[in-house]
């Protein structure tokens, strides 16, 4: 008899889950203001009022208690801007985690450098500092650390390594908006913090991004790189003039945020701390409930003082269930929950199907881009056994968390139905 919903059985839940993205109060008014402002981008003519983009940049910098923020069109753009602002280019190597979204590797290749994936810590699933140390060569031009899912990486060790070798550390905070390490917001420890505001993120405008830095010179380089070689004007321009100055200091590309996106982000930012607190409370319930089923929750580094959840993540410890693979288990759990956002972990970077530089003509002749030869045993294990739950589910209530636990319990009890 078939019991699992994924095989045609009855699901344990039919109610819908919290909708994400959820607009902040006043979002429609803000969008209407942009719509009728005569200015839809930072590159549009000044209309006597500071752009939403510059207002968001100031607010995001203040949120992080840091001097500078440069908005960008996406998280990928923010990482590309940070890499190039740090001087990374042709022939350089950039250390990245072996477990992360594909953009960390493809963006490094996009600046004509070579991604070097290293293994992750089995508890945090973030960069293993010892593996980073072993991977450094004379060609290493940057280290990209990703604060993955809900964990903050070991920034004490990683900043020490970067400083000792005089290599820029770039924090990819696309999954860690608002997290704190030793009471400082993440993104403020390296040369740059980079952020994504893509649809699924806890701070979103559909697409978007930003870089933050405490270094005025790096910020100025970032401004040039994302606005076709232009920077913000130091003084208020006249009505009808540009709020961007053509300096001819550094050639750039167009990776700017639109005024619509910036207007949305200003409202969303005001809700972030409150939403993160709700996610933390529900994550604690999952830690207890799913932990009792033999799913080991991801932990954060000891210096973490405020954790945030892009996704709750945990490793299935039972060998009999774990060997089935999260690629089968996650959809089965989601089916029990009427399509809740339950996913398998990212695949390891040495087996990531989305990373295919050989399919792009621009990468011909660049040696070292094939990552299949790297050994990443911890990342490979995570790809087989780590399951994740998107933060939108964590905006529910205690009964929702109980449903998630019940769904896993049912799938685990009937896991033999999933064997091929």
From Swiss-Prot:
UniProt similarity note: Belongs to the DegT/DnrJ/EryC1 family. L-glutamine:2-deoxy-scyllo-inosose/scyllo-inosose aminotransferase subfamily.
Keyword Transmembrane helix: no
Coiled coil (UniProt feature): none
Domain of life: Bacteria
Record GO terms (molecular function): pyridoxal phosphate binding; transaminase activity
Annotated organism of origin: Micromonospora echinospora
Keyword set, alphabetical order: Aminotransferase, Antibiotic biosynthesis, Pyridoxal phosphate, Transferase
Annotated metabolic or biological route of this protein: Metabolic intermediate biosynthesis; 2-deoxystreptamine biosynthesis; 2-deoxystreptamine from D-glucose 6-phosphate: step 2/4; Antibiotic biosynthesis; gentamicin biosynthesis
Residues with the N6-(pyridoxal phosphate)lysine modification: 201
Class of this enzyme: transferase
Function: Catalyzes the PLP-dependent transamination of 2-deoxy-scyllo-inosose (2-DOI) to form 2-deoxy-scyllo-inosamine (2-DOIA) using L-glutamine as the amino donor. Also catalyzes the transamination of 3-amino-2,3-dideoxy-scyllo-inosose (keto-2-DOIA) into 2-deoxystreptamine (2-DOS).
GO biological process: antibiotic biosynthetic process; polysaccharide biosynthetic process
Taxonomic lineage from the root: Bacteria, Bacillati, Actinomycetota, Actinomycetes, Micromonosporales
S-S pairs: none
EC number: 2.6.1.100, 2.6.1.101
Entry cofactors: pyridoxal 5'-phosphate
Catalytic activity, as annotated: 2-deoxy-L-scyllo-inosose + L-glutamine = 2-deoxy-scyllo-inosamine + 2-oxoglutaramate; 3-amino-2,3-dideoxy-scyllo-inosose + L-glutamine = 2-deoxystreptamine + 2-oxoglutaramate
Name of the protein this chain belongs to: L-glutamine:2-deoxy-scyllo-inosose aminotransferase
UniProt keyword Transferase, yes or no: yes
One Pfam family from the record: DegT_DnrJ_EryC1
């Amino acid at each position: 008899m078939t019991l699992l919903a994924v095989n045609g059985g009855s699901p344990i839940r039919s109610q819908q889950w919290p909708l994400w993205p959820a607009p902040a109060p006043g979002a429609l008014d803000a969008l209407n203001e942009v719509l009728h402002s005569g200015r839809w981008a930072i590159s549009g003519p000044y209309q006597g009022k500071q752009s939403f983009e510059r207002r968001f940049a100031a607010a995001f910098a203040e949120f992080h208690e840091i001097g500078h923020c440069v908005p960008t069109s996406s998280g990928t753009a923010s990482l590309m801007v940070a890499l190039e602002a740090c001087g990374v280019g042709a022939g350089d190597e950039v250390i990245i985690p072996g477990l992360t979204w594909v953009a960390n590797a493809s963006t490094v290749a996009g600046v004509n450098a070579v991604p070097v994936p290293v293994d992750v810590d089995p508890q945090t699933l973030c960069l293993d500092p010892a593996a980073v140390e072993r991977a450094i060569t004379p060609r290493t031009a940057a280290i990209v650390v990703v604060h993955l899912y809900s964990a903050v990486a070991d920034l004490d060790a990683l900043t020490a390594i970067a400083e000792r070798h005089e290599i820029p550390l770039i924090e990819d905070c696309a999954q860690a908006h608002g997290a704190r390490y030793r009471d400082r917001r993440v993104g403020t420890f390296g040369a740059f913090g980079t952020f994504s505001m893509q649809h699924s993120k806890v701070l979103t405008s559909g697409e978007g991004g930003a870089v933050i830095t405490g270094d005025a010179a790096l910020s100025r380089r970032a401004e040039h790189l994302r606005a076709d070689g232009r920077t913000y004007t130091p003084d208020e321009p006249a009505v009808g003039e540009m709020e961007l100055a053509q300096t001819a200091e550094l050639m750039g590309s167009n990776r700017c945020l639109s005024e619509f996106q910036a207007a949305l982000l200003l409202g969303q930012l005001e809700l972030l701390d409150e939403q993160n607190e709700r996610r933390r409370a529900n994550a604690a319930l999952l830690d207890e409930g799913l932990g009792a089923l033999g799913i080991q929750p991801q932990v954060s580094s000891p210096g973490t003082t405020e954790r945030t959840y892009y996704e709750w993540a945990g490793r299935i410890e039972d060998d009999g269930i774990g060997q089935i693979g999260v690629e089968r288990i996650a959809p089965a759990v989601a089916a029990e929950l009427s399509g809740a956002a339950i996913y398998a972990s990212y695949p390891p970077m040495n087996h990531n199907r989305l990373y295919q530089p050989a399919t792009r003509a621009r990468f011909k002749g660049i040696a070292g881009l094939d990552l299949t030869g790297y050994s990443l045993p911890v990342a490979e294990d995570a790809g087989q056994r780590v399951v994740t739950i998107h933060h939108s589910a964590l905006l529910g209530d205690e009964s929702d968390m109980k449903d998630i636990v019940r769904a896993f319990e049912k799938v685990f009890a009937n896991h033999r139905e999933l064997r091929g």
